[in-house]
Amino acid sequence: MQIGNIRLSAPVALAPMAGITDMPFRIICKELGCGLVVSEMVSAKGLLYKNVKTFDMLRIAQEERPAAIQLFGSNPMELARAAKIVEADGADIIDFNMGCPVPKIVNNGEGSALMKNPQLAYEILARMADSVKIPVTVKIRAGWDEKNINAPKIALLAEKAGVAAIAVHGRTREQYYNGKADWNVIKKVKETVKIPVFGNGDILTAADGLRMLKETGCDGLMIGRGADGNPWIFTEIINALNGSCGKYEVPLDVRLHMIERHLQMLKDFKGEVIAVKEMRRHAGAYLKGMPMAAEYRRRINELNTCEEFGALLREYRNEAEKFLAAKHNFCSEAD
């Protein structure tokens, strides 16, 4: 799959997620087969005001390329200037956010609010595309609400503006992340434009991904919440695309090793205090569905140092292995 002049190793992308898709997590997903990773959304105004924390979000490691930086805002001139900054900083692709449903973003006329203003969206995308040489992409929703499903119209305008690819989340802004994604909207977008289309929404397994490709005809898959705590979904999907249909069951030890590694990467990237704070949430996602997960998620939220994290993980490993061994013995006796 190709976006402009950027060749992807696989037609599977990591969706931008605030508080999740920072550099460490993007590297992990890339190592597990993801073809394109996208940053957390970055404020165009923050870049223009030279905010240090905002500029930190532009950092890209060589091993995660190709990588896209996602911008948000609503002022065409500001976004064009911000796009130039992102390009100069070394991004491979610039993505534009038209999907965020959060009130503080929408109330500023940004994110999914732009689904209600097609002409402004077109002007923004045209100015961004004209201002840089690297590909510009956009992520949209099905529409504002069920009475205003306009993703195909927005997609056509985006293509006209010079956008190189488009990702479509099959939910409206009104839905947030509730209910079901309407994959038929993704199909209509694919039928409307010639540029590559990523389908997004309700892809939690490889089977979901294969079904979306078949039902919508989309060119690629964009995985968001399905990768949260489960970056192995990229390996599973790529294996499925290559003909292996079995679900990849991630062993407990592999999950715990990933938590340890992710914590170390966060520490190296952001320092121990922030790393531990952010890893509480990540660890909870990694442990979802594991034995005694609820109890240990609660205890993880009380941790303050990497040393405490390591000690609790060692305790959990021992207790979980005992639990699984006892369960195995019980099942053997029952047979």
How does the language model describe each region?
Residues M17-G19, V42-A44, F72-S74, G99-P101, ...:
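Active-site beta-loop-alpha junctions enriched in small/polar residues
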